[in-house]
Amino acid sequence: MPAKFILRLTPPIEGRLAPLHKIWFNAVGGRMLKRKTRFLKTGKLEIRILKKFLERNTILDPRVVIGPEIGEDAAVIDPGRSADRYWVVTSDPITFTTEMIGYYGVVVNLNDIAMMGAIPKWFSAVLLFPEGSDLKGIEKVFRQIHDACHRFKVSFIGGHTEITPGIKKMILSGHMIGEVKKEKLVTAGGARPGDFLLLVKGVCIEGTSIMAREKEAELLKRGIPSSVIRKAKRFIFDPGIEVLRPARIACEVSSVHAMHDPTEGGLINGMIEMAWASDTEIEVDLEKVLIYKESRLLCQEFGMDPLGTIASGALLLAVPPSDLMPIRKAFRKNSIPFGVIGKVRKGPARVLRIDPKGSKELKPLPRDEILKIYD
């Protein structure tokens, strides 16, 4: 029986883009096979695709306690046996907006550190400016970074800045390092059956601010009052995209099993990431989720689901029933809104929406709803 072999034929480019498919020739059957390239949509990689890539990763250093894992907000490194603390390391870019990009960059990265029960300490950033940028604009971004670091007691320790050809708007990629006592480490994968699922503040906080900042003129044309737009712009400060404070309070008064800040893909993807990380089933009542009226209004204008919109400012907590009361008292004392929206169960890694009609599994969103404002 003749051996099968496959030839990959690559036509010459000749000053143009290569064809959008690859061609294989099966020598036995004499058939020409075309396989179309799958072009990925904007936004995070789908969870199942990312999981396949991460499974190929090899950790060479035994001091890595937590490496790249689905749902985890940061990596964890043990600096040595004599140390009583872990180093917690994260990276996060800002790509959806350019207004207040320096503030965004610091806060979304310190949020990731806070999710591990850690205190953010050191920040660095790669700042890529498009051609045509001026010194005034660059200075503005540096001022935003400086002010945010000063506010949250973080040291800005370096990075890289350049004018980059081929990009249309500025991109910031931030990197944060923090510390946590070894016995205080919290992970997204720590949720246990029987835990209550808490949501601190509401959803779509960051998305609401982005819509107002990026599409102000369009919203005004659609008849949205300027007062609503002004308030929505300030959502990054009030209710705020920072969750360091509520995370610290929760860790101080209770034995939090898991924390996660839902970002791209909103609350829906955030809960799914926690379920995957902890290998548990999460039951959620979406009617108990806080959605601000400004968020509902702006999402309606762009045909977006606030539950699937970038959600920095929200905080997911998995806590044992015995710790629910201490957290409730502490949050109320500090005027931090929260609600019990679900429960963690033993079962397959998934999220079930529970309502009077029954239950339905929530599927991961392939792209964040905020991208609809750019379509």
Give, region by region, the residue ranges found by the protein language model.
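Active-site-proximal betaalpha loop/short-helix elements
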Residues: 130-132, 234-311
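Helix N-cap motif at beta-to-alpha junctions
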Residues: 319-324
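Solvent-exposed alpha-helices and their adjacent loops that cap or buttress functional pockets
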Residues: 67-69, 77-83, 149, 164-169, ...
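Phosphate/diphosphate-binding glycine-rich loops and adjacent basic-rich segments that engage nucleotide
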Residues: 181-238
